UniProtKB/Swiss-Prot annotation:
The reaction(s) this protein catalyses: ATP + H2O + aliphatic sulfonate-[sulfonate-binding protein]Side 1 = ADP + phosphate + aliphatic sulfonateSide 2 + [sulfonate-binding protein]Side 1
Gene it is expressed from: ssuB
Binding-site list for ATP: G67, R68, S69, G70, C71, G72, K73, S74
Record-given protein name: Aliphatic sulfonates import ATP-binding protein SsuB
SUPFAM superfamilies in the record: P-loop containing nucleoside triphosphate hydrolases
Family: Belongs to the ABC transporter superfamily. Aliphatic sulfonates importer (TC 3.A.1.17.2) family.
Record InterPro entries: AAA+_ATPase (IPR003593), ABC_transporter-like_ATP-bd (IPR003439), ABC_transporter_ATP-bind (IPR050166), P-loop_NTPase (IPR027417)
SMART domains the record matches: AAA
Compartments, record wording: Cell inner membrane
GO cellular component terms given for this protein: plasma membrane
Length: 269
């Protein structure tokens, strides 16, 4: 599914196209994109949603954004995706793979709480959307990675909620995006399925090296997945928490302490 068209988002200002440099990059280099957000503002009429926001995200980093409802989390994600325009300020991208003049729709993919599968297409055909003939085998490979190889010929209505989100994840990764945006994709799932999806997302993130940004109301989920947790409050970054816990993460005293620290910070906003 193409989420954007005709994007022309600038790279870092000191960055120049260097084909000889990009050619020397190893094929195994991370595909994630570095993101630099500077003095970002977003208004809807007279209502300020994001104000003077600065954020630097490293290539391949996993960021979680938390905060109360209405603090600007999903708005920030839509601005990064190019689904909305900034009021002013800049969002710049730099590829860890090679330099490029801008960023395309295939470079950024979004997963929502609603998987948005086409009901008249099979699971395999949903994942194949937007792929050319040479790329079609990628869809089958991804369905195998997410544990749905045996469901390829079924319809979305035949799948559970967790299986539909696994399909959406496979579809999002079919174009090898540099950035994966996760807008509360696990919010409607039961607890066990949610844990399974967290593990799957983490495994594919580690395998593929994309930059991941997760919006969530679940502080435990943020601690489970993120390298860094950003707390938004009234359109500003209120706090930032480094998550220096080994992966894969398990419940521990350190995990619980950080979870409580972040939760108390959210409740204090």
């Amino acid at each position: 599914m193409t989420i954007m068209s005709n994007l022309n988002i600038p790279l870092f200002p000191d960055q120049e196209k260097d084909l000889s440099s990009s050619a020397s990059q190893p094929e195994t280099a991370p595909i994630g994109a570095e993101i630099l957000i500077e003095q970002l503002h977003k208004f809807y009429g007279q209502i300020k949603v994001l104000e003077d926001l600065d954020l630097h995200i490293q290539a391949g980093e996993f960021i979680a954004i938390v905060g109360r409802s209405g603090c600007g989390k999903s708005t920030l994600l839509r601005l990064i995706a190019g689904l909305e325009h900034t009021s002013y300020g800049e969002i710049k991208f730099k590829s860890a793979r090679h330099f490029r003049e801008g960023i395309t729709s295939d470079d950024i993919r979004v997963m929502f709480q609603d998987p948005r599968l086409l009901p008249w297409k099979s699971i395999l055909h949903n994942v194949q959307l937007g792929l050319n003939k040479q790329q079609l085998p990628i869809a089958e490979q991804l369905l195998e990675k997410v544990g749905l190889k045996d469901k390829a010929g079924q319809w979305p209505s035949q799948l559970s909620g967790g299986q539909r989100q696994r399909t959406a994840l496979a579809r999002a990764l079919s174009h090898s995006p540099r950035i994966l945006l996760l807008d509360e994709p696990l919010g409607a799932l039961d607890a066990l399925t949610r844990l399974e999806m967290q593990s799957l997302i983490e495994r594919l993130w580690k395998e593929q090296g994309f930059t991941a940004i997760l919006v969530t109301h679940d502080v435990s989920e943020a601690v489970q997945l993120a390298d860094r947790i950003i707390l938004l409050d009234k359109g500003h970054i209120a706090q930032s928490f480094e998550v220096n816990l080994p992966r894969p993460r398990h419940k521990s005293l350190e995990f619980a302490q950080l979870e409580q620290q972040v939760l108390e910070a959210v409740l204090a906003t």
